């Protein structure tokens, strides 16, 4: 797996910014171990909205089949996948699983590029926003993955337009170091009061 950005004709997912500069619909994806949240932008790349929640299918990849269909039906120009790095910035098992998922997706939708963005605390932010809207806990479970995908995509859209700093979604973004790499503080970002940070089991 290369850490560089996706290039035209290169189906490998990439981490670099900025992404594809063409106008058009972009798809945001929040990959969990149980469910996959999907969001989409308007063609102007201003607003992200929820699309659906897919059940993971590790054997038959039915969820990837549905994602491919969504990308094609909406004529998406790019797919943005949240990368659940640990609060320290290190990559654990969850990140490896997401990278593998994204590689399969990238091969299926090439030449549409697939790009990673840091999604730390995204699910926390999704839970918080739904709580603020009065969504009950039981209903929240079925919606949180879509909301997390919205958070991932909206932050990327805002960063692209220069109205949000690239970095951690759902909390204040740390400044980039001299080498241009964004790193979390030593103790990691602090979750909002009363909110339990998400686990990898989503």
UniProtKB/Swiss-Prot annotation:
Looking up InterPro entries in the UniProt record yields:
RNaseH-like_sf, YqgF, YqgF/RNaseH-like_dom, YqgF/RNaseH-like_dom_sf
An example of a Pfam family matching this protein is RuvX
Where is the sequence biased in composition, kind Basic and acidic residues?
A: 9-20
Q: Where is this region: Disordered?
A: 1-27, 170-202
GO cellular component assignments:
cytosol
Q: Name one GO molecular function term.
A: nuclease activity
Q: Which GO terms describe its biological process?
A: rRNA 5'-end processing
UniProt KW keywords: Cytoplasm, Hydrolase, Nuclease, Ribosome biogenesis
- SUPFAM superfamilies named in the record: Ribonuclease H-like
- E.C. numbers: 3.1.-.-
What is this enzyme's class at the first EC digit? Answer: hydrolase
Subcellular location, record wording: Cytoplasm
Domain of life per record? Bacteria
Entry's family note: Belongs to the YqgF nuclease family.
* Its job: Could be a nuclease involved in processing of the 5'-end of pre-16S rRNA.
PANTHER family in the record: POLYNUCLEOTIDYL TRANSFERASE, RIBONUCLEASE H-LIKE SUPERFAMILY PROTEIN (PTHR33317:SF4)
Q: What is this protein called?
A: Putative pre-16S rRNA nuclease
């Amino acid at each position: 797996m290369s850490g560089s950005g996706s290039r035209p004709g290169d189906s490998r997912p990439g981490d670099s910014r900025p992404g594809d500069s063409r106008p058009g619909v972009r798809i945001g994806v929040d990959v969990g171990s149980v469910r996959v949240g999907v969001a989409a932008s308007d063609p102007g790349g201003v607003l992200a909205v929820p699309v659906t929640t897919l059940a993971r299918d590790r054997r038959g990849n039915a969820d990837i089949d549905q994602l491919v269909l969504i990308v094609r039906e909406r004529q998406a120009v790019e797919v943005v996948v949240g990368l659940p790095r640990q609060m320290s910035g290190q990559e654990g098992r969850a990140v490896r699983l997401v990278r593998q998922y994204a590689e399969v997706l990238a091969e299926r939708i090439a030449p549409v590029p697939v790009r990673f963005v840091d999604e730390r605390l995204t699910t926390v932010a999704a839970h918080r926003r739904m709580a603020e809207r009065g969504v009950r806990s039981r209903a929240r479970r079925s919606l949180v993955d879509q909301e997390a995908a919205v958070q991932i995509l909206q932050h990327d859209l805002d960063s692209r337009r220069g109205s949000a700093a690239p970095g951690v979604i759902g909390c204040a973004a740390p400044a980039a170091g001299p080498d241009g790499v964004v790193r979390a503080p030593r103790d990691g970002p602090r979750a909002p009061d009363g909110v339990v940070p998400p686990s990898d089991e989503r």
